[in-house]
């Protein structure tokens, strides 16, 4: 524990106490020690009295452990800057030969010090601090830090214990880095105390700015926290649920119920929902007009893709809903010791990559969301070669109508370059696809994954399809939570996926190979980032 004075000199608690002990005249507290007491009170949000009590307790316990002083009393007057340490002895009879010289003193010996003492009184013998050892100071500091931590924890628990799991808005005060300068986390100002959010509690790739306010979930209060007891999170699913509820009146009033959320923070989320009113489409209500609501929420999480899925109590139907927009041809529920927990799903060959997602994120989310122990995905050809006898799907997934309408929408003359939506019908206008595709076009000189978008859509074709007036009408405007911070606009891949021809020689080889599950001619990717 250190404090820096105006002179620039940094003084520790131990150093100041040594200075104090060597300059004792009337057991006066020196200025560095007084300053440290004030600083501890300020930074830990404790009163001066609480810090002084911790120092008193630390000194008493250190003396008892170090010098076997069983009965020691410390009195500190902070206002006058005076500290007194005394050893206490019970006055006993001179005839008592078995007295404990650490706790007791014969009457005759006591009267030599104070003639007014009688049997049963307590003799207070001052202990000079000028000869205090560094070992005793180290013990005192360790106990003092422990007592401060315990006192601070009690204060924090009293204020925040009922708020664990709640969402708060708070300002980033400082950044915490390792010796190499790498990010460890951030210190968050909670007004009456501080909170801490580690790097692992952030969305993937997320960086916070000092001085800005963000939304956090109070995850837990740790008694033995090395920094601050309140642990905060932005990767917790409760923050996503809070934003969905705040931005969707139908969730807030109970018409729509969020059944389950699975997240890969900063990458992708899947939310299972159900409507208690047949007239209310839960997916459309959450997405909002032209997807504005969900786009704003996505920006809060560094562009995280958010999929809304129709929940169904039938485990199989729920799985088929979660796999959308990919088409499920058939399935085979494995009959083994884990009956009804594993399933094999058959989809079109060119949609396998889409089902798996980048680095398998999508299939993991699907499995966790729907409760299947494992979900294995095959093309018809692979299923046949593996002698998998599957049952052809005899029902349509919920939410299929809007997807079927847009799945084969062509925006170029090349029949192999197709864009299809994953949203519900009447949520996003057909014109949006043209506008977003144009926004993704980049200069030929830039070597970025977005080059693929230029191969898909020719500028001249876009200009023919959309007039300047129409473009102005369909510009999506993201509705962001009033207190949220967005580092960049929502990615277009929140709205659609693209199918590219893997045989196109202009594509880099690793752009296809890294996403290819089977050597098919055509592969479907979750987003432009996946290419």
Curated annotation (Swiss-Prot):
CDD domains: KH-II_NusA_rpt1, KH-II_NusA_rpt2. Gene3D superfamilies: 3.30.300.20, Nucleic acid-binding proteins (2.40.50.140), NusA, N-terminal domain (3.30.1480.10). HAMAP family: NusA_B. It is found in: Cytoplasm. This is Transcription termination/antitermination protein NusA. Belongs to the NusA family. Residues 476-490 have a biased composition (Basic residues). The keyword Isomerase does not apply. SUPFAM superfamilies: Nucleic acid-binding proteins, Prokaryotic type KH domain (KH-domain type II), Transcription factor NusA, N-terminal domain. It comes from Mycoplasma genitalium (strain ATCC 33530 / DSM 19775 / NCTC 10195 / G37) (Mycoplasmoides genitalium). Keywords: Cytoplasm, RNA-binding, Transcription, Transcription antitermination, Transcription regulation, Transcription termination. The gene is nusA. InterPro entries: KH_dom, KH_dom-like_a/b, KH_dom_NusA-like, KH_sf_prok-type, NA-bd_OB-fold, NusA_bac, NusA_N_sf, S1_domain. Residues 513-531 have a biased composition (Polar residues). GO terms for molecular function: DNA-binding transcription factor activity; RNA binding. PANTHER family: TRANSCRIPTION TERMINATION FACTOR NUSA (PTHR22648), TRANSCRIPTION TERMINATION_ANTITERMINATION PROTEIN NUSA (PTHR22648:SF0). Residues 463-475, 502-512 have a biased composition (Basic and acidic residues). Participates in both transcription termination and antitermination. GO terms for cellular component: cytosol. Pfam families: KH_5 (PF13184), NusA_N (PF08529). Residues 463-531 are annotated as: Disordered. Monomer. Binds directly to the core enzyme of the DNA-dependent RNA polymerase and to nascent RNA. Its main location: cytoplasm.
């Amino acid at each position: 524990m250190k404090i820096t004075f105006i002179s620039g000199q940094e003084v520790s608690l131990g150093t100041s106490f040594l200075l104090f002990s060597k300059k004792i005249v009337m057991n006066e507290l020196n200025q560095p020690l007084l300053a440290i007491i004030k600083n501890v009170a300020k930074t830990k949000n404790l009163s001066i009295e609480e810090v002084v009590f911790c120092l008193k307790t630390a000194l008493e316990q250190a003396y008892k452990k170090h010098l076997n002083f069983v009965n020691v009393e410390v009195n500190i007057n902070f206002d006058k800057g005076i500290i007194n340490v005394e050893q206490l002895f019970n006055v006993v009879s001179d005839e008592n030969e078995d007295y404990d010289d650490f706790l007791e003193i014969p009457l005759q010996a006591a009267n030599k010090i104070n003639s007014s003492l009688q049997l049963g009184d307590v003799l207070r013998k001052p202990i000079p601090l000028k000869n205090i050892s560094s070992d005793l100071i180290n013990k005192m500091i360790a106990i003092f830090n422990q007592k401060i931590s315990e006192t601070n924890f009690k204060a924090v628990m009293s204020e925040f214990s009922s708020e664990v799991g709640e969402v708060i808005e708070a300002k980033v005060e400082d950044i915490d880095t390792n010796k190499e300068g790498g990010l460890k986390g951030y210190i968050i100002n909670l007004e009456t105390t501080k909170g801490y959010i580690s790097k692992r509690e952030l969305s993937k790739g997320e960086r916070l700015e000092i001085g800005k306010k963000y939304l956090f979930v109070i995850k837990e209060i740790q008694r033995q926290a090395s920094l601050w007891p309140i642990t905060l999170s932005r990767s917790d699913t409760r923050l996503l649920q809070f934003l969905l509820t705040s931005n969707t009146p139908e969730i807030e009033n109970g018409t729509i119920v969020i059944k389950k959320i699975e997240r890969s923070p900063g990458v992708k989320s899947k939310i299972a929902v159900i409507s208690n009113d047949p007239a209310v489409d839960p997916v459309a209500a959450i997405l909002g007009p032209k997807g504005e609501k969900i786009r704003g929420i996505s920006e809060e999480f560094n562009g995280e893709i958010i999929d809304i899925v129709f929940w169904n109590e039938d485990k199989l139907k729920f799985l088929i809903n979660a796999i959308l927009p990919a088409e499920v041809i058939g399935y085979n529920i494995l009959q083994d010791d884990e009956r009804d927990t594993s399933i094999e799903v058959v989809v079109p060959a060119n949609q396998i990559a889409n089902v798996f997602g980048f680095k398998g994120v999508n299939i993991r989310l699907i499995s966790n969301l729907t409760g299947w122990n494992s979900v294995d995905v095959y093309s018809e050809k692979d299923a046949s070669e593996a002698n998998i006898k599957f049952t052809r799907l005899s029902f349509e997934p919920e939410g299929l109508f809007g997807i079927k309408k847009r799945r084969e929408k062509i925006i170029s003359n090349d029949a192999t370059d197709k864009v299809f939506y994953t949203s519900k019908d009447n949520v996003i206008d057909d014109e949006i696809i043209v506008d977003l595709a144009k926004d993704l076009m980049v200069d030929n000189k830039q070597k970025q994954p977005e080059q693929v978008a230029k191969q898909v859509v020719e500028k001249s074709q876009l200009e023919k399809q959309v007039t300047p007036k129409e473009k102005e009408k369909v510009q999506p405007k993201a509705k962001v939570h009033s207190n949220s911070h967005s580092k960049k606009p929502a990615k277009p891949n929140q709205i659609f996926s693209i199918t590219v021809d893997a045989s196109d020689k202009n594509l880099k080889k690793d752009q296809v190979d890294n996403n290819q599950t089977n050597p098919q001619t055509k592969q479907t990717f979750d987003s432009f980032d996946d290419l």
